[in-house]
């Protein structure tokens, strides 16, 4: 019996559509002689799997549909929940292996500032940067290039 691969795509962010395209590319290039491949569309409201041309809901309790259980997941989800550690934690809890890094590393690298803080002590060259917090109000009239340079992180 060939391993059953769920190619997950979609997600909860503005990257949803590009993720669907990425998933389609993966679907087009997986060796169907070696693997039994299923497209799984992840959306905030529902997760659906395509079986014989029909879309059916995934049972979230065990990531299955009808009598189909997946052996491995190919993660093509951009943004949340595919790149921030959420989906990785979910599959870890079910014991289903997946492509990509661990939940912990995914969560870290999703936050670019935290990633740079983590890497900086290891002597890697870092670009100078400024952190802007969405809730902060910025007086753009008072900000100049010189002002920004004076407040850059090392």
Annotate each language-model stretch with its function:
Residues 117, 144-145:
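Short, surface-exposed amphipathic charged segments that create phosphate/polyanion-binding patches used
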